[in-house]
Amino acid sequence: LKNLGLDLAIFYSTSKEVFEGFKNQGFDSILCSVDFDDYAKKRDEEIAKIIPMQTFFDSFITHPNDCLKADKTPYKVFTPYYKNLEFIWNSYRLEEFETNKNLKLISYDFDFIPTLENMGFIKQTLPDFLQKNPDELLKDFEQKIDNYKIDRDFFDKNATSNLSVHLRFGLISPRQVFNKIKELRARTENKEFFVRELFWREFYNYILFHFP
């Protein structure tokens, strides 16, 4: 964010209180990435009653309604779902959202950060991979991807990309991961296997959406 001339404001309260505060300060809309789990849907419905929301679809590659069977019902099995999306996963590159160059930083005390103790947490020692940004993890993974298909099943081997947390919290989009994996200097079949795992993540969200 700071590379874009922006910063991150952190709030610790209920969603209702935070967004009522935004409305009282004169904000006219909220822009955010859509989420499909039950909690997120209820939260966003509550927020939308307070202040208009404009959602973007960047947490996943495909929208759950964009891949249906011929009878317009959702898939329940991964393989036919995945085959239906071949035109996507067989692509060399996916289009990514561009950053708005006209975003401006508002006046706010960005140095204020609630402590873990304030929020009822105990400080933990984070694993090494959480100290790295997504680009660093992808660079590390380039050395492991050719053995990923076999080694990923062994817990004693650091064989995965370690990107799950970064994907979940929007530090990198799945489209960016897809594109960066396709660019790696690795055997095509090994890159395709990892891309298939990305679509397993898509399918999990797909099932959650259609069968809550």
Give the ranges of each region predicted by the language model.
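Glycine/tryptophan-enriched, flexible segments
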Residues: 73-211
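Trp/Phe/Arg-rich N-terminal binding region typifying the photolyase-homology
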Residues: 1-90, 190
